[in-house]
Amino acid sequence: MIGPDGAADRLTDIMTEYLRDGASIYRRSFAIIRAESDLSAFAPDVAGVVVRMIHACGQTDLTRDVVATEGVVRAARNALTDGAPILCDATMVASGITRRRLPADNEIRCHLHDPAVPELAERMGTTRTAAALELWKPVLDGAVVAIGNAPTALFALLEMIDAGAPRPAAIVGAPVGFVGAAESCAELAARADLEFITVTGRRGGSAITAAAINALASPEE
């Protein structure tokens, strides 16, 4: 149906002229994000990570909720360049990491589906996602951590560190949800002894977390 304002003609023009080149789409997307977002609170290297996070969720007001330490980008990139593993709480986070951006063909680990995890979770009285972190301990020292699904995993990580577990080089902590997400991110944001980037409040998720890791892995947009 063609309306009096020529809406159908405009739709045809859009369908004919839409961008098809992937690189051009990325460049235009990042330009729009930078034009519409207030990134003034962030150092340039952190701002680059935040742009990627916004690109993953489509919400430019995410800048109001992102909290990051001054040295998180440097710490994460140094660790990844040295070959540190990336430890993920969920397979969706792991799947979202772009391997070609990794500087040292870094190992990506997610132990959620390890056969030992259900028994661990039952014994510990916690979620499987949190219990799976027990299997991180041998490689946690100097690793890059990506938690984008379960608040219980972020709480468990902070408890492990407080109990003397090795410290990761950097943490991306952005679990999503209505129960525990805001609280766990607030706990991380209050830590002066860790390098991190987090999203306060209920927002977060696997896509945002993986996008942050991809940005930390390489400065290339």
Residue positions per predicted region:
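Generic structural signal for well-ordered, non-membrane alpha-helical segments
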Residues: G22-F30, F42-V46, V50, T69, ...
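Predominant activation on well-ordered alpha-helical scaffold segments within soluble catalytic domains
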Residues: R27-R34, V51-I54, R74-R77, A94, ...
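C-terminal functional extensions of proteins
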Residues: V179-E221
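N-terminal nucleotide/polyanion-binding subdomain common to many enzyme families
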Residues: D13-G83
